[in-house]
Amino acid sequence: MTASAWGLLALFLSVLGLLAWPLGRGLAAVCDGRLPGWMHRAEAPLYRLAGVRPEAGMHWRHYALALLAFNALGVFAVYALQRLQGVLPLNPQGLPAVAGDSAFNTAVSFVSNTNWQGYAGESTMGYLVQMLGLSVQNFLSAATGIAVAFALARGFAARGGDGAGHVGNFWADIVRITAWVLVPLSFVLAVFLAGQGVIQNFTAYQDVATVEATVYQDPQSDAQGQPLKDASGNPLTREVRTRTQTLPMGPVASQEAIKMLGTNGGGFFNANSAHPYENPTPLTNLAQMLAIFLVPAALCFAFGRVVGDWRQGVAILAAMTLMFVVAVVAVTAAEQAGNPALSALGADPVASALQAGGNMEGKEVRFGISASALFAAVTTAASCGAVNAMHDSFTPLGGMVPMVLMQLGEVVFGGAGSGLYGMLVFAILAVFIAGLMIGRTPEYLGKKIEVREMKLTSVAILVTPLLVLVGTAVAVLAPAGQAGIANPGAHGFSEVLYALTSAANNNGSAFAGLSANTPFYNVLLALAMWFGRFGVIVPVLAIAGSLAAKKRLPPGPGTMPTHGPLFVALLVFTVLLVGLLNYVPSLALGPVVEHLVLQAR
C-alpha cells in the first residue's frame, strides 16, 4: 500500500469513530424509547391512525409476522409501481412498464435491502418509481434491519425472566427509526451532496453535441436478453458512431443519501457511484463511504449501552474493524500490484508522482486505486453494494476480497442492523465453543446459551451458504444460466458465484460481466435475496425471544469475559472458520485458479 492509501484509511476510521459514538447514544435512546416529549407527541397521531399501542410489547412470533407482512406488502407495492410505470406521471422520457420478471426481481431486491440491479436505472425507471417505490424501500428496509438488531439487543438486556419473551413493538420501532434516525441523517447528507454537485431535479434528459465523434462497440443480444456469441464463443458486437450524448437527469441527491446511510446501494444510474452525477468529487466519495459504515458502527456503541456495558459494543466493533483493515490492505495491495499480463508487455505498474500505477482498468481517475479499493472493501464489508469502480475489472485476488467479505455473512460492519445481529449470532457461537472447551454451560451477557439457541444459531449461519452454493450449482448446470456467462473459464464461474453471494447475503454489487437481466437469473436471484434476508431474520428474532424469556444472571468467577482482546480474537477466529470454510472449494475453482493462470502467462 502507498502512503496515500494508509493515510486515507486512517482518516476514514478516525472520522467514522468520531461520528459513530454520538449517534450510538441516540440509537440507544430510540431503542429504549427514551425520547423527548415532543417526539412522543409527534408520533401519537400515527399510532392512533394505525390502531397501534407503542408501549405494548410483542412476542417474537408476532414481531416476526408483522415484519414479514409489512415487507411482503412492500414487494407488492414496488412491483405494481413498476408494472404501471407507463401510465404514471413524473416520467419525462416516457419509459414503458418494466417487464414482469425484472419488476419482481427489483421489488424483492429493494425490500430485502439488497438493491441488486439487473437493469440500467436511467433507461428503465421513471422519477416517480425511483422516489415512491425504490427510495421509500431504501428507508423501510434499513429500518427493518435496525429493528431486528434492537429486538436482539432487548433480548440480551431483558432481566425479568417472566417467560413472556417480548422483544419490543415492530410498528413503533419502524416509525421511530425512520422518523428520528434515517430521515434526519438523510436530509443532512442530501443537502451536502447537492452542494458538492450531485444533481437534484425533475427535468427531462438533455441531448448535447460532443466535441468529436465517439465510436464504441455495442454488445448484441437476442429477444430474451441473452448475449449473442460467434462460433468461437466470443460476444458479438456492432460498431456504433455518434456525435451526440444524452445526459440523464433526476432527483439523485435525495436518493443517494439514503442509498448510503441505509446500506442499500442501488444506484440512480447504471454506473452507480462511479457516475459523476452521483459521486462527483473525492470529498463526496469519502462522505459516501462514511455514510455506509455510520449506522453499523453506531449500532455497536448503542448495543453496549442497551445491555448496560459499553465495553461489549466496543469489543464487537473491534472485531469488525480488525477484519476490515486486513481486507482493505489485501484488496489495495492486489490492485496496486497491477496486471502481470500488462507488465509482461512493458507496462510499469509502480506508483509514482506521474502515475497511479497498478490496475486502473474499471476505475475512475478522479478516485484512483486507493479510494476505489477502499470503497470496494467498505461496500462489501457492509451489505451496501454501491460501487465507484467495476469489481469485474479487479485483479483475481483483488476481486476475491470483496467476495470473501460478503461470504463471511456480511458481519464485518454489515448492513444497517443486519451487521450487528449477524455478528451477535457468531458471538453466541463463539461463547458456545469456549464453553465446550472449559466444560461449562456457556453464557453471554448473563443469558445461558442452551440447545434452543444453538439450533437457531446454526440455522441463521447456514442459510446463506446453502443458498449461495446450491444457487451457483443450479446456475452453472442449467442451460439458461450458462447462456448468461459472457466470459469463459474461471472468471465466468467467479461471476456466477459473485452474483449468488451478493444476492443471498443482501449486498447487491456484481461482477457486471454476467447477463443477469433474464427470467432465469431474475427469479433465481430474487429467491436467494428473499430467503437470504428473512431466512436469517426469523431465527434471529426467535433467539431474541428465547433470551428475553430468561433471567439475566450476574457474572460469576467462571464467567468468560466478553469484552477483552481474548474474546475479540475468539470471535474473529469463529467468523473466519465457520463463515469462510464453506466457500473454500468454490473460491479455489474461481478467483484462485484465475490468479494462478494469470501468473503463469
Curated annotation (Swiss-Prot):
One of its GO terms (molecular function) is potassium ion binding. Its main location: membrane. NCBIfam families: kdpA (TIGR00680). The keyword Plastid does not apply. This is Potassium-transporting ATPase potassium-binding subunit. It comes from the Bacteria. Part of the high-affinity ATP-driven potassium transport (or Kdp) system, which catalyzes the hydrolysis of ATP coupled with the electrogenic transport of potassium into the cytoplasm. This subunit binds the periplasmic potassium ions and delivers the ions to the membrane domain of KdpB through an intramembrane tunnel. It is a multi-pass membrane protein. One of its GO terms (cellular component) is plasma membrane. The chain crosses the membrane at residues 3-23, 62-82, 132-152, 179-199, 283-303, 314-334, 367-387, 397-417, 419-439, 459-479, 523-543, 564-584. It comes from Paracidovorax citrulli (strain AAC00-1).
